[in-house]
Amino acid sequence: VHPRPYLVCFNHCEHVTLENVTLTNSPAWTVHPLYCRNVVIRGLNIKNPADSPNTDGIDPDGCQDVRIHDCTIDVGDDCIAIKSGTEDTPNRQGCERLIISNCHFLHGHGVVLGSEMSGGIRNVVVSACVFYETDRGIRLKTRRGRGGTVEGIQLNNLVMEKVMCPFVFNMYYFCGANGKMKHVWDKAPY
């Protein structure tokens, strides 16, 4: 079985600019910078069906120095998901120094940290963004074993209208092949 492909993926790239394009109907994550440095994503219009799971808008993963601005994202899953690998990822590279500004998020899950965060997520600024009818605004999701730390997150001048849960923190996020894993009864961190 082959997983659905990403629409756009940059792997181990430096000095990437993706701007002023419309991306629609992605089979999986729409834009996936992986282990990249100095990435600028601006002026994107991303539209995926509201009932399409795992069709995230932009998912920087293990990246440094990323600027995402002036984008409109309307998807069936995470609008932006900041990631840094799972517990099985051999290269646990942190995702750090991200600026997300002047974006509009429609429907979907807003701006998400995780659930893949074994390398840590550091120094993220989300500012001057509008969330309209998203089911979440800012969401942190992880689970035991993922490891990693989250630090230096700044949220400034955000507008959330008709957002079901503006802030969600889930430390027992279920994931796996069928979307569920056995519940953990032991509350020890590792």
Question: Language-model features: where?
Answer:
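Extracellular/periplasmic carbohydrate-active domains that bind, remodel
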Residues: 1-190
